[in-house]
Amino acid sequence: MKNLFEAATVSEIQERMAHLRPDSERQWGKMNVAQMLAHNSAWMEMAAGLNSPPRALIGRIFGRVAKKKVLGSEQPIGRNMPSEKSLIVSDEREFVAERERLLQWTNAFAAAGPSGCTTHPHCFFGPMTPLEWARMAYKHLDHHLRQFGV
C-alpha cells in the first residue's frame, strides 16, 4: 500500500497537486480547493503532533474496526466522509499559499520519516503506528485530490 514515506508516492501526490487550479471544481463535499489544501495541511500537522484533537466517542466505539477496513484495503476512502471538526476549514484561503504550504508538509513528513509522526492517537482511528500514519496520509490526500478531479 502506498504511503508518504516513499519518495515515488510523494512525487505522485505533488504532481497531482500541480494540476489543481484556483477554480478547480469539487465533485463532492463543501470545501473549495484552497480550503481543501488548508484542511490537508491541518491533517498533516495532526500527523506530526502539532495538534491533537481528542478522541471522539464514535471513534472509541468504531475506530479500530474502521481503521482495519480503511488501511487493510487499496480501496480509496469513500465520498462525503465526516471530518474532525477542528480540521474543517470554512474561511477563505489563498490558493497559491495553501498549495505551497501543503507541498512543504508532504516534503517535511517524508523527510522526518517514522520519528516525525505523533504518538498521540488519531481522533477517530485511535493509536496508529508511523507506517499507518503514512498510509493514512496518502489515502487522505488521494481522497481530496480525487474530490477535485486530479
Which stretches of residues belong to each language-model region?
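Alpha-helical bundle segments that constitute or directly flank the non-heme di-iron/ferroxidase center
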Residues: M1-P22, H39-S41, A48
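Structural signal for well-ordered, non-membrane alpha-helices
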Residues: Q14, A18, M44-E45, L103-A110, ...
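Short, amphipathic alpha-helical "lid/cap" segments that border enzyme active or binding sites
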Residues: V10, Q14, L37, R99, ...
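Short alpha-helical hairpin
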Residues: V10-E15, R79, G113-H120
